[in-house]
Structures are given as structure tokens and as C-alpha cells.
Amino acid sequence: GWIALPAVLLLGARRGRYTKDGMISAHPPSNIPFLALGAWILTVGWFGFNVMSAQLIEAVSGLVAVNSLMAMVGGTLTALVLGRNDPGFIHNGPLAGLVAVCAGSDLMHPLGALATGAIAGALFVWMFMVTQNKWRIDDVLGVWPLHGLCGAWGGIAAGIFGAKALGGLGGVSLTAQLIGTLGGVTVAALGSLVVYGLLKRFVGLRLDPEAEFNGADLSIHKVSATAERETNW
């Protein structure tokens, strides 16, 4: 997420997304079923890499699995309510919770994981709208709010809900989590700025105007993302 932010800023908004008179042009998702399919493939697969990150069957922790599920539930519920049934928020809500719980899934009490996921779901919905509508940063997939901000919140949440006072297993420091999270954010953002800055300077990041108008799916892969646009109306 923090690698994506400089890339999105350097790339710039889609043509016509923000007009000179301050209006925002709507660009609805091209395929809601595929959006849902992709999000839930990630959600199901998340349990594979998060629970099996120990890489040994003997080391698998049931707590990690339960906490992953609880965070997913929290993220889904808050995204459903705050996103007002928007499918983009509904299907990304569970991912927001799962992103956030990764850092502390082996430490937190399940209720702490639920709270972590719920806050992440709310954070994603709120910051996606702020990013797009107020700051006019055209992060189409919401990668920065979903992975960057929810991931940073998860790093901090591990230091909060991992404490014994809140039902966690302890052995974690909020100060250390803050420092580690800030360090990770800094390295990712600065590294991305350098790499994408060089790419923009010497190669270029955008398609040509005609290819942008037709869309990357049609221009690069020769398949339109929206079949209804192939009609003659």
C-alpha cells in the first residue's frame, strides 16, 4: 500500500476523472461479479498464508485462524454499514480486516481481533472516500487505504490488543510497534518514490491518450473489460 501511494501520485488521475470546475466524473467498476470473485479468492487464500506462515503443520496456531476469522467479520460488518451496501466496500471490507490482523494474529484475544478488523473496515471506507473525493488522489483500487493504512493500523493494533491488559498474550511493546510500523512505511514509500520516479523520467508510466481512452484491457490484452460497450448503441 505504501509502495502504491507514490506510484499513484506520479501516475496521476485518469483522464476526465476530475474536471476543471471541481466536479468528479463517475467511473463505475467494469465487472462487479469479477470484483467479488477476486476479493473472495484473496479472502479464502488469506487463511492459507496467514495460518501456515509457520511453514510447519506442528506449529500451526488455532488462535491465528480464529483471529483471522474474527477480524474478517469485523471488517465486513463495518464496511457493510458505513459503505451503505456499496459492493466495492462490502467485498473489500473482509480484506481490510485480514490485512490489519496479520501483525497481531498470534497475540490478540479474539475480541481484540474483532475490534482491529472493525476499525480497519471503517478506516478503509472513510479514507477511500477522502482520497478519491477530497484529496483527488485517483487510487482506483483503493490500494493505499486498504493495504497501506489498514496495514499500518494493524502494526499499531498488535501493540495495543496484544497486551495482557486487553486479553492478549503479551510480550509486545506499543512503542516498538510504532517504531517498526513507521520504519516500514518510510522504507516502502521512499523506495517506491525513487523507483517509480526513475521509471516516469526515463520510460514513462502512462499509456498514450488513445490507448487510455480505449482502456488498458482492450489496448494491451485486446479484450474489452465491458461487454456492453461492444454493442452498436
Predicted regions and their residues:
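Hydrophobic alpha-helical transmembrane bundles of multi-pass membrane proteins
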Residues: 1-233
